[in-house]
Design a protein with these regions (language model features):
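Conserved small/polar residues in nucleotide/adenosyl-binding loops
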Residues: 183-189
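Beta/alpha (TIM)-barrel catalytic core signal, keyed to glycine-rich beta->alpha loops juxtaposed to Asp/Glu
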Residues: 1-178
Length: 193
């Protein structure tokens, strides 16, 4: 696979290689192969949000930092759960009701709603919307270089851009986010909980 990607770059069909959904050890192997092939590799795309912190547990985030490779986070708002969209129930025009492929009604449990409300309160205390805080949190340490957001309205894009105005978090804020997001999950070694 790395050979095919290198071939695409060397033939001029692509400028750089980007990978998707690798864990830390696999990223390290891929980077070594691409380096040997003298092929520029710059980015890895993975799902990442306050509710899905797999890249912290599988070593990808630490490996990307060590190798100085970027990460593009997709689904940073957890399919809309990390917005104010579902705070008062499931709207009829919501993704859950109209599509259901990526976000199912069963995902919005009472326990999840409690977490969303806790995070919403924390965001309000920071002077941000929940979506702004969720995006700011992803960008807080400079390891994730970009986020992919889906917007159904232009104003959602403008609101999401506001996230970059406040990417600083106190230790207490990070601890609270960790406490909410790691309920029933295995903690990574760098957790503050």
């Amino acid at each position: 696979t790395m050979g095919a990607l290198a071939s695409a770059v060397q033939s001029g069909k692509a400028l750089y290689v980007g990978l998707s959904n690798y864990d830390g050890p696999t990223l390290e192997k891929a980077e070594a192969i691409l380096r040997d092939l003298k092929c520029p590799f710059v980015i890895n795309q993975n799902r990442y949000s306050i509710f899905d912190r797999t890249i912290e547990k599988n070593g990808l985030k630490d490996t990307a930092k060590k190798l100085e490779k970027g990460i593009i986070a997709f689904s940073p708002l957890a399919q809309g759960l990390l917005t104010d969209r579902y705070l008062k129930g499931i709207p009829e025009d919501s993704r859950i009701m109209t599509d259901g492929r990526f976000l199912k009604k069963s995902a919005l449990t009472e326990e999840k709603l409690v977490k969303i409300r806790e995070l919403n309160g924390l965001a309000a205390g920071r002077g941000q919307t929940l979506a702004e805080m969720a995006l700011s949190w992803i960008l807080k340490d400079g390891i994730v270089t970009s986020v992919l957001v889906g917007a159904s309205k232009p104003e959602q894009i403008l609101d999401n851009i506001k996230a970059i105005q406040n990417t600083e978090f106190t230790e207490e804020e990070l601890r609270k986010i960790d406490a909410v997001s790691y309920t029933h999950l295995t903690l990574p070694t760098n957790s503050r909980v």
